């Protein structure tokens, strides 16, 4: 999982990427390609 300042580029990497909030943190997850994960902050 990458830790990034901004998730805009992480979200744009694949059309299946979704932005979700869990426990006050913002994540990008991808069910089709689980390698495309990122966390903000």
UniProtKB/Swiss-Prot annotation:
One GO-annotated biological process of the protein: translation
Gene Ontology cellular-component terms listed: ribonucleoprotein complex; ribosome
Disulfide-bond pairs as recorded: none
Molecular functions (GO terms): structural constituent of ribosome
Keyword Protein transport attributed: no
UniProtKB keywords: Ribonucleoprotein, Ribosomal protein
SUPFAM superfamilies per record: Ribosomal protein L36
InterPro entries for the chain: Ribosomal_bL36 (IPR000473), Ribosomal_bL36_sp (IPR035977), Ribosomal_L36_bact (IPR047621)
Origin superkingdom: Bacteria
Family: Belongs to the bacterial ribosomal protein bL36 family.
HAMAP family: Ribosomal_bL36 (MF_00251)
Name of protein: Large ribosomal subunit protein bL36
Species of the source: Acidiphilium cryptum (strain JF-5)
